């Protein structure tokens, strides 16, 4: 039946949270830690690798001229990117848009004061068992990153670098959540535990 069917005459829908809700909460959390938090976009779409390069460029601009935020800063974005499998990748590896985003961002970073995490808020990134990953300029070698991107095997690469973020299924989905952290005091490599975090039971009352 369509929305005009009598069965839905007294039905109503309420949106409890969306991507902007998550970004706003993340911004408030960053501000409590002393960061200048800026939401740069709520609806990033398109190629994950392109978005990764663009976010890395924002980070470099933040370091060099203090725009669009002055360090220590956190640049946040939401939306959902995609990965287009190339013809050369007949048997793609394990990965997803969030893993591809951070690997591509890591390749483009020059400053060691930038850390880039990206997660899917439902806890599952593409074909992997992780929510996403986290990198800085030193997490991955250029050669390994380029090989993984060519095979779309980015989650495997991040796992080898102890740079996957695993939460388990979260019971919700408000798109992706990306944070570009610009702070001389942060380091990404080896900072994320490989142990899953217990996700809340969506049926719990």
PLM regions and their residue ranges:
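Internal helix-turn-beta structural module
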Residues: 91-204
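Structural signal for hydrophobic packing residues in well-ordered secondary-structure cores
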Residues: 26-37, 55, 59-67, 109-110, ...
């Amino acid at each position: 039946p369509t929305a005009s069917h009598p069965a839905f005459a007294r039905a109503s829908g309420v949106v409890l949270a969306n991507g902007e809700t998550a970004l706003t909460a993340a911004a408030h959390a960053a501000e409590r830690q002393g960061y200048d938090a800026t939401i740069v976009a709520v609806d990033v779409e398109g190629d994950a690798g392109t978005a990764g390069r663009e976010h890395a460029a924002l980070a470099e601009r933040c370091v060099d001229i203090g725009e669009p935020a002055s360090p220590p800063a956190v640049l946040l974005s939401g939306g959902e990117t995609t990965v287009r499998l190339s013809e050369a990748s007949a048997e793609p590896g394990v990965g997803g848009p969030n893993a591809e985003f951070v690997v591509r961002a890591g390749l483009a970073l020059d400053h060691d004061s930038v850390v880039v995490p990206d997660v899917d808020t439902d806890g599952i990134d593409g074909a992997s068992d992780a929510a996403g990953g986290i990198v800085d300029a030193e997490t991955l070698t250029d050669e390994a990153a380029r090989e993984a991107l060519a095979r779309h095997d980015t989650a495997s690469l991040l796992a080898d670098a102890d740079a996957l973020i695993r939460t388990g299924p979260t019971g919700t989905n408000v798109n992706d959540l990306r944070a570009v952290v610009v702070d001389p005091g942060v380091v990404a490599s080896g900072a994320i535990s490989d142990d899953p975090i217990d996700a809340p039971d969506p049926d719990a009352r």
